[in-house]
A protein has these predicted regions:
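Thiotemplate assembly-line natural product biosynthesis machinery
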Residues: 1-19, 72-79
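C-terminal structural segments of small proteins and small subunits
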Residues: 51-78
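Phosphopantetheine carrier-protein modules
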Residues: 12-31, 48-59
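Two-component histidine kinase catalytic core, primarily the HATPase_c
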Residues: 36
Length: 79
């Protein structure tokens, strides 16, 4: 799941040839913007069947936080 997420995330930000780390603050990437945010939310729903609300999303800092949130939501039924 982690590899799929990172691959999809890199595609969203057009960073396929760049190295990223789970500890990275994803909001600090140069191409992070509102369109990337919407694309990420859509990808998490389509690929992993989870929905993360805005207030919850604001608390997520790193790529690892995103992965942990997806895993927690999958256990909790997606919502």
């Amino acid at each position: 799941m982690e590899k799929k997420f990172l691959t999809d995330f890199k595609e969203i930000l057009e960073m396929e040839n760049e190295e990223i780390h789970l500890s990275d603050n994803f909001r600090e990437y140069e191409k992070w913007d509102s369109l990337a945010y919407l694309s990420l939310i859509a990808m998490m729903d389509e690929e992993f069947g989870v929905q993360i609300e805005g207030n919850e999303f604001k608390k997520l800092i790193t790529l690892n936080d995103l992965i942990n949130a997806i895993n927690a939501k999958k256990i909790d039924g997606g919502n």
